[in-house]
């Protein structure tokens, strides 16, 4: 029986690649050895070259073929730089001019890659992540030795200039934002000290529960003038100050005075945590813990009248032994229980009983500026705080219990209606 034989296949001809392709593959292989990111940058430069060539051909026509109706002609090349891999990379930019030579014709691909806004944003993000200008280049992705040799834009001074430009834009955008479309139910105002200066910042809570950084102002202290200027600026930018609004503050008299000067119907909620600290700081440690427990129990009481009665009783108990603590407890006592009188449910009250939300935003600003060793001037303080507020906004979530905010709006309107005569009543 004859054995089955496999058919003999003809020899496959050796694939011979053009020299141009072989050189390109060798360059890509070299970049691949330096890492995938370096390969991506090398590929990006190659793709950019093809895009530029395609733009030129679309405007001028194929090289060597005369087009009588063409409106532009090739005009050689010129050294230029594009943004790739967090750097400014040198490439040769083809030039195209009108047939009469009077004007340069822009190439869409070049217009897309040439701007430096991306580098400004990268500098802002990395600096706010506490990467110093000295270590900036070490934090960039690898782009390959060949690209690195000619790349620019990573020096300490260049990064610093870009960061300043980016933070100036962040400050300008924050202070110029249109607020007319915001439907605020609550507002928080607090101060932050940076070096020898004080910045007052404002955070709004909208009807749908979003937290919105509103603005900031700089001064020597947290005084009524600085706060009033900040709030008046919000009003000038379109914020409605005629509707009732819950304003949460830490109890500083300057804040309260400025709020009542600018807003027509503010309903003040003093931060319960600040009140607790102010009282217990005036007590010996053995007594402070007991007083703190009684204050927390009263603050969380379902009945605001009973809560106020308990706190007034506690103040009387402290009158003889610790009069300073008793006076601190009585000062603005009713305003620490505002959310209870408004019937705010516990889930939403957790957010509105204190200034924790705005203090968390301030803490993020401080964290981002941790590497700053020398504050040159007030403008530098404003730039850093504004940039930090912008970064904090990216981390914001809707407040707990936001579904109860429409009910809070109704309660605020009802509260004001009971103390403010209507136009019809005044006429009568």
What are these regions (language model features)?
Residues 1-12, 19-31, 43, 49, ...:
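Acidic/histidine-rich catalytic cores and adjacent linkers
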Residues 2-4, 65, 72-77, 82-99, ...:
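RNase H-like nuclease fold core
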Residues 2-110:
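Short, conserved DNA-binding cores of transcription-related domains
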Residues 52, 136, 186-192, 211, ...:
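Short, conserved catalytic/metal-binding motifs centered on acidic residues
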Residues 91, 279-309, 313-316:
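Metal-dependent DNA phosphodiester-chemistry modules and their immediately adjacent helices/loops
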Residues 118-130:
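Short, amphipathic alpha-helical "recognition" segments used to contact nucleic acids or chromatin
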Residues 129-142:
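Short, charged amphipathic recognition helices of the HTH superfamily
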Residues 264-281:
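Inter-helix linker motif
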């Amino acid at each position: 029986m004859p054995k089955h034989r496999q058919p003999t296949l003809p020899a496959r001809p050796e694939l011979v690649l053009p020299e141009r392709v072989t050189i390109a593959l060798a360059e890509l292989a070299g970049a691949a050895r330096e890492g995938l990111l370096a390969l991506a940058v090398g590929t990006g430069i190659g793709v950019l070259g093809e895009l530029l060539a395609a733009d030129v051909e679309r405007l001028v026509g194929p090289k060597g073929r005369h087009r009588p109706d063409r409106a532009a002609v090739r005009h050689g090349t010129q050294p230029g730089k594009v943004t790739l891999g967090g750097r400014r990379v040198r490439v040769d930019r083809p030039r195209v001019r009108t047939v009469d030579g009077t004007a340069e014709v822009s190439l869409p691909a070049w217009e897309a890659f040439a701007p430096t806004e991306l580098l400004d944003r990268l500098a802002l993000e990395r600096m706010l992540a506490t990467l110093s200008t000295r270590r900036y280049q070490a934090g960039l992705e690898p782009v390959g030795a060949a690209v690195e040799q000619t790349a620019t834009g990573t020096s300490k001074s260049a990064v610093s200039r870009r960061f300043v430009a980016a933070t100036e834009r962040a400050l300008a955008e924050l202070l110029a934002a249109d607020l007319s479309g915001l439907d605020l139910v609550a507002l928080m105002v607090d101060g932050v000290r940076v070096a020898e200066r004080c910045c007052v910042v404002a955070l709004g809570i909208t009807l749908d529960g979003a937290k919105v950084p509103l603005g900031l102002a700089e001064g020597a202290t947290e005084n009524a003038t600085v706060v009033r200027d900040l709030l008046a600026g919000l009003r000038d930018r379109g914020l409605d100050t005629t509707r009732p609004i819950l304003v949460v503050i830490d109890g500083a008299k300057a804040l309260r005075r400025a709020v009542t000067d600018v807003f027509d119907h503010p309903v003040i909620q003093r931060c319960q945590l600040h009140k607790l600290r102010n009282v217990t700081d005036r007590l010996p440690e053995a007594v402070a813990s007991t007083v703190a427990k009684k204050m927390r129990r009263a603050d969380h009481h379902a009945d605001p009248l009973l809560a106020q009665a308990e706190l007034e009783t506690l103040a009387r108990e402290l009158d003889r032994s610790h009069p300073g603590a008793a006076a601190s407890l009585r000062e603005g006592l009713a305003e620490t229980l505002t959310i209870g009188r408004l019937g705010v449910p516990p889930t939403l009250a957790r957010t509105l009983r204190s200034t924790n939300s705005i203090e968390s935003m301030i803490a993020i600003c401080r964290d981002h500026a941790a590497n700053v060793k020398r504050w040159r001037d007030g403008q530098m303080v404003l730039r850093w705080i504004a940039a930090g507020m912008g970064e904090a906004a990216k981390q914001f979530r809707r407040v707990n219990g936001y579904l109860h905010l429409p009910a809070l709006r109704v309660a605020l309107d009802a509260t004001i209606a009971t103390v403010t005569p209507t136009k019809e009543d005044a006429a009568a």
